[in-house]
Amino acid sequence: MNCNTYLKEFSSRLVLKDNEKEHIDNSIKYIKSRLQIYFGSKIKDVKVFGSYSRKTVLPRIIDQSSDIDIMVVFNNIDGKPQTYLNQLKAFAEYYYKNSIVRQSLPTVVIELNHIKFELVPSGNVFGWSQYFADMYNIPGKNNEWLNT
């Protein structure tokens, strides 16, 4: 095998296959739908971010720690981050009884067969959101909110 052939074969393993992407997209759709049902008007938006949204996520066969990051934007975050992490964990345990669900600050992890999903509670930064629409509070250390 020459170097060019090896590199082509290797690089093809670094890209999600269509069926893997389809499984992930379906899971994202179901998670979003279930979040809307479970929380109703308590949440403002559900956003996929990170490597999957940038189309740089690696297949799990290459990177066992590959995950899909999902930000759950709550309408009002008047409590501490742990309050919202607990709510997301309760959601995950309710809908994903046969999956591994755990908290891993600042997220709640749902381990499905094909990939891990990390749910991050958040809320818009009040007072700035009219100027910077993509500014959010997310959990930080010491159970405090961080601006991003």
PLM feature spans:
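Conserved catalytic core of two-metal-ion nucleotidyltransferases
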Residues: K32-L35, L85-M135
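Short beta-strand-to-loop capping motifs
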Residues: V72-N76
